[in-house]
Regions:
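Short, charged, intrinsically disordered terminal tails
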Residues: 199, 205-219
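Cytosolic beta-strand hydrophobic patch enriched in CBS
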Residues: 14-15, 33-50, 90-91, 109-123
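Tandem CBS (Bateman) regulatory domains
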Residues: 1-10, 50-91, 97-104, 116, ...
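A generic structural motif
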Residues: 186-193
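Short proline/glycine- and acidic-rich turn/helix-capping motifs at secondary-structure junctions
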Residues: 178-186, 216-219
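Short loop/turn motifs at secondary-structure junctions and domain boundaries
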Residues: 25-31, 102-106
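Short, basic/aromatic recognition patches
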Residues: 18-25, 97-101
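Residue-level detector of anion-binding/catalytic polar loops
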Residues: 33, 109, 170, 210-211
Protein backbone atom coordinates (compact mmCIF):
# COMPACT_ATOMS: atom_id res chain seq x y z
CA UNK A 1 0.00 0.00 0.00
CA UNK A 2 1.26 3.47 -0.89
CA UNK A 3 0.90 6.69 1.06
CA UNK A 4 -1.56 8.07 -1.49
CA UNK A 5 -3.88 5.17 -0.63
CA UNK A 6 -4.01 5.79 3.13
CA UNK A 7 -3.25 9.48 3.69
CA UNK A 8 -5.84 12.03 4.77
CA UNK A 9 -6.47 14.14 1.68
CA UNK A 10 -7.19 17.86 1.84
CA UNK A 11 -5.98 18.22 5.45
CA UNK A 12 -6.81 21.27 7.49
CA UNK A 13 -4.07 23.85 6.95
CA UNK A 14 -3.25 27.08 8.76
CA UNK A 15 -1.44 30.32 7.87
CA UNK A 16 1.63 31.64 9.64
CA UNK A 17 -0.38 34.51 11.13
CA UNK A 18 -2.79 32.24 13.03
CA UNK A 19 -2.85 32.88 16.77
CA UNK A 20 -1.89 30.02 19.07
CA UNK A 21 -5.30 30.20 20.75
CA UNK A 22 -7.01 29.96 17.35
CA UNK A 23 -4.86 26.96 16.45
CA UNK A 24 -5.88 25.26 19.71
CA UNK A 25 -9.55 25.89 18.96
CA UNK A 26 -9.19 24.68 15.37
CA UNK A 27 -7.51 21.44 16.44
CA UNK A 28 -10.05 20.80 19.20
CA UNK A 29 -12.99 21.49 16.89
CA UNK A 30 -11.71 19.06 14.27
CA UNK A 31 -10.28 16.51 16.73
CA UNK A 32 -6.78 16.63 15.23
CA UNK A 33 -3.33 16.78 16.83
CA UNK A 34 -1.23 18.06 13.93
CA UNK A 35 -1.66 21.18 11.84
CA UNK A 36 0.52 21.89 8.78
CA UNK A 37 1.40 25.57 8.47
CA UNK A 38 1.51 26.87 4.90
CA UNK A 39 2.48 29.97 2.99
CA UNK A 40 1.47 30.98 -0.51
CA UNK A 41 0.07 28.20 -2.70
CA UNK A 42 -0.23 25.68 0.15
CA UNK A 43 3.55 25.39 0.39
CA UNK A 44 4.68 23.86 3.67
CA UNK A 45 6.44 26.27 6.01
CA UNK A 46 6.06 24.46 9.32
CA UNK A 47 4.06 22.14 11.56
CA UNK A 48 2.26 22.82 14.82
CA UNK A 49 1.15 20.12 17.25
CA UNK A 50 -0.90 20.08 20.43
CA UNK A 51 2.32 19.47 22.35
CA UNK A 52 3.86 22.61 20.85
CA UNK A 53 0.84 24.62 21.95
CA UNK A 54 0.90 23.31 25.52
CA UNK A 55 1.90 25.84 28.18
CA UNK A 56 4.97 24.57 30.03
CA UNK A 57 4.44 23.46 33.63
CA UNK A 58 7.05 25.86 35.02
CA UNK A 59 5.11 28.74 33.49
CA UNK A 60 1.81 27.75 35.10
CA UNK A 61 3.11 28.54 38.56
CA UNK A 62 3.82 32.17 37.71
CA UNK A 63 0.74 32.96 35.58
CA UNK A 64 -2.93 33.13 36.47
CA UNK A 65 -5.63 31.92 34.08
CA UNK A 66 -6.08 35.35 32.51
CA UNK A 67 -2.37 35.76 31.95
CA UNK A 68 -2.16 32.33 30.34
CA UNK A 69 -5.05 33.22 28.04
CA UNK A 70 -3.40 36.52 27.12
CA UNK A 71 -0.06 34.77 26.54
CA UNK A 72 -1.65 32.33 24.09
CA UNK A 73 -3.56 35.14 22.38
CA UNK A 74 -0.31 37.02 21.78
CA UNK A 75 1.54 33.98 20.43
CA UNK A 76 1.41 33.13 16.72
CA UNK A 77 1.94 29.66 15.32
CA UNK A 78 5.04 30.90 13.50
CA UNK A 79 6.65 31.43 16.91
CA UNK A 80 5.89 27.91 18.17
CA UNK A 81 5.90 25.65 15.12
CA UNK A 82 8.51 23.20 13.91
CA UNK A 83 10.20 25.17 11.15
CA UNK A 84 9.86 23.99 7.56
CA UNK A 85 13.42 22.73 7.18
CA UNK A 86 13.00 20.58 10.30
CA UNK A 87 9.64 19.05 9.37
CA UNK A 88 9.95 15.41 8.28
CA UNK A 89 7.80 14.86 5.18
CA UNK A 90 6.94 12.10 2.74
CA UNK A 91 5.71 11.91 -0.85
CA UNK A 92 2.53 10.14 -2.05
CA UNK A 93 4.45 7.41 -3.91
CA UNK A 94 6.29 6.08 -0.84
CA UNK A 95 5.12 2.93 0.98
CA UNK A 96 3.26 2.74 4.28
CA UNK A 97 6.05 0.66 5.79
CA UNK A 98 8.55 3.40 4.92
CA UNK A 99 6.28 5.95 6.62
CA UNK A 100 6.08 3.74 9.71
CA UNK A 101 9.87 3.41 9.78
CA UNK A 102 10.34 7.19 9.47
CA UNK A 103 7.85 7.94 12.23
CA UNK A 104 9.45 5.35 14.51
CA UNK A 105 12.98 6.56 13.78
CA UNK A 106 12.17 10.22 14.42
CA UNK A 107 9.63 9.56 17.21
CA UNK A 108 6.92 11.64 15.55
CA UNK A 109 3.17 11.18 15.14
CA UNK A 110 2.61 12.41 11.60
CA UNK A 111 4.16 13.11 8.21
CA UNK A 112 2.90 15.91 5.97
CA UNK A 113 2.56 14.54 2.44
CA UNK A 114 4.10 16.87 -0.13
CA UNK A 115 4.63 16.99 -3.85
CA UNK A 116 7.21 18.97 -5.83
CA UNK A 117 7.86 22.38 -4.34
CA UNK A 118 6.69 21.34 -0.85
CA UNK A 119 3.04 21.58 -1.90
CA UNK A 120 0.93 19.93 0.82
CA UNK A 121 -1.44 17.32 -0.64
CA UNK A 122 -2.20 15.32 2.50
CA UNK A 123 -1.07 14.13 5.89
CA UNK A 124 -0.44 10.63 7.24
CA UNK A 125 -0.74 9.99 10.97
CA UNK A 126 -0.29 7.07 13.34
CA UNK A 127 -4.03 6.43 13.07
CA UNK A 128 -3.82 6.25 9.27
CA UNK A 129 -1.06 3.63 9.50
CA UNK A 130 -2.97 1.60 12.08
CA UNK A 131 -6.05 1.69 9.86
CA UNK A 132 -3.96 0.45 6.92
CA UNK A 133 -2.58 -2.38 9.06
CA UNK A 134 -6.12 -3.39 10.00
CA UNK A 135 -7.15 -3.44 6.34
CA UNK A 136 -4.13 -5.55 5.40
CA UNK A 137 -5.23 -8.18 7.93
CA UNK A 138 -8.83 -8.22 6.76
CA UNK A 139 -10.65 -5.97 9.21
CA UNK A 140 -13.51 -5.31 9.68
CA UNK A 141 -14.96 -8.36 7.89
CA UNK A 142 -15.51 -11.61 9.79
CA UNK A 143 -13.42 -14.72 9.19
CA UNK A 144 -11.03 -17.21 10.75
CA UNK A 145 -7.67 -15.69 11.74
CA UNK A 146 -4.85 -18.22 11.90
CA UNK A 147 -1.15 -17.81 12.69
CA UNK A 148 1.13 -20.49 11.23
CA UNK A 149 4.78 -20.82 12.28
CA UNK A 150 7.13 -22.29 9.70
CA UNK A 151 10.86 -22.75 9.06
CA UNK A 152 12.55 -19.71 7.57
CA UNK A 153 13.51 -21.33 4.30
CA UNK A 154 12.58 -21.25 0.65
CA UNK A 155 9.31 -22.91 -0.32
CA UNK A 156 7.55 -23.05 3.06
CA UNK A 157 5.11 -20.23 2.35
CA UNK A 158 4.32 -21.73 -1.05
CA UNK A 159 3.31 -24.98 0.66
CA UNK A 160 0.94 -23.08 2.91
CA UNK A 161 -0.61 -21.25 -0.04
CA UNK A 162 -0.95 -24.54 -1.94
CA UNK A 163 -3.23 -25.89 0.79
CA UNK A 164 -5.43 -22.79 0.60
CA UNK A 165 -5.68 -23.18 -3.18
CA UNK A 166 -6.47 -26.88 -2.83
CA UNK A 167 -9.32 -26.03 -0.44
CA UNK A 168 -10.51 -23.26 -2.79
CA UNK A 169 -10.40 -20.77 0.07
CA UNK A 170 -10.14 -17.04 -0.36
CA UNK A 171 -7.83 -14.79 1.65
CA UNK A 172 -9.07 -11.52 3.16
CA UNK A 173 -5.79 -10.44 4.69
CA UNK A 174 -2.26 -11.71 5.11
CA UNK A 175 0.97 -10.72 6.80
CA UNK A 176 4.31 -12.35 7.61
CA UNK A 177 6.95 -11.47 10.18
CA UNK A 178 10.01 -13.07 11.82
CA UNK A 179 9.32 -15.02 15.00
CA UNK A 180 10.51 -13.12 18.05
CA UNK A 181 13.75 -14.50 19.52
CA UNK A 182 13.94 -17.27 16.90
CA UNK A 183 15.49 -16.27 13.54
CA UNK A 184 15.06 -19.81 12.19
CA UNK A 185 11.27 -19.45 11.89
CA UNK A 186 8.68 -16.90 10.86
CA UNK A 187 4.93 -16.51 11.31
CA UNK A 188 2.25 -16.04 8.68
CA UNK A 189 -1.04 -14.48 9.78
CA UNK A 190 -3.92 -15.24 7.43
CA UNK A 191 -7.60 -14.33 7.58
CA UNK A 192 -9.91 -16.69 5.68
CA UNK A 193 -13.63 -15.99 5.05
CA UNK A 194 -16.56 -18.41 5.02
CA UNK A 195 -14.84 -21.29 6.83
CA UNK A 196 -14.94 -22.79 10.30
CA UNK A 197 -12.09 -23.04 12.78
CA UNK A 198 -12.33 -26.82 12.56
CA UNK A 199 -11.94 -26.79 8.77
CA UNK A 200 -8.87 -24.57 8.91
CA UNK A 201 -7.35 -26.56 11.76
CA UNK A 202 -7.76 -29.84 9.87
CA UNK A 203 -6.36 -28.56 6.56
CA UNK A 204 -3.33 -26.66 7.88
CA UNK A 205 -2.34 -29.23 10.49
CA UNK A 206 -1.45 -31.59 7.64
CA UNK A 207 1.51 -29.44 6.48
CA UNK A 208 4.80 -30.99 7.71
CA UNK A 209 7.05 -28.79 9.87
CA UNK A 210 4.41 -26.05 10.12
CA UNK A 211 2.63 -25.31 13.39
CA UNK A 212 -0.62 -23.48 14.10
CA UNK A 213 0.25 -21.22 17.04
CA UNK A 214 -3.06 -19.34 17.17
CA UNK A 215 -6.48 -19.75 15.56
CA UNK A 216 -9.68 -17.87 16.30
CA UNK A 217 -12.85 -16.41 14.82
CA UNK A 218 -12.23 -12.70 14.27
CA UNK A 219 -13.89 -9.56 12.96
Amino acid sequence: MLIRDCMTRHPILAPLSLRASEAQALMAENNIRHLPIVGDGKRLTGLITRERLAVKADMLGSLNVWEISRFLSDQRVRDLMVKGKDVITITPDRTVERAAAMMTEHKIGCLPVVEEGDLVVGIVTENDLLRSYQEMLGLPSAGVRVTVRMPNRHGEFVRLMAVLVEQNWGVMGIGTFPTRRDPTTYDAVIKIPNVTIEEVQAALSSIPNQLIVDIRAAV
